[in-house]
Regions:
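C-terminal structural segments of small proteins and small subunits
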Residues: 57-86
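Compact, glycine-rich, soluble single-domain proteins
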Residues: 7-54
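Generic N-terminal amphipathic, Lys/Arg-enriched alpha-helix
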Residues: 1-6
Length: 86
């Protein structure tokens, strides 16, 4: 399992659809956890509804977990996208 942390920093022109297209390249399962006080919400990023339910916004701190044969690349791609990278 590959785990990393990131801070959301998305421009307005980035969409959930773009993220789902990035994830379609990988076979690994990628989970994002968003902490809210003592609790957290989590969603499988291959589920658009799950991602929407997290209600991510700029400045949110998240944990990204990947499991599978290409987990390192999948987690890195998600972290780069969500933190505002190319």
């Amino acid at each position: 399992m590959k785990v990393t942390k990131a801070i959301i920093n998305l421009s307005e022109d980035r969409t959930i659809l773009e993220l789902s297209q990035i994830l379609a390249q990988f076979s690994s399962v990628v989970i994002v956890k968003k902490y809210e006080g003592a609790f957290y919400k989590e969603a499988n990023l291959k589920s658009i509804l799950g991602l929407i339910s997290l209600r991510l916004k700029n400045g949110d701190q998240i944990t990204i977990e990947g499991t599978g044969e290409d987990e390192e690349q999948a987690v890195q791609a998600v972290a780069t996208f969500l933190s505002g990278g190319a």
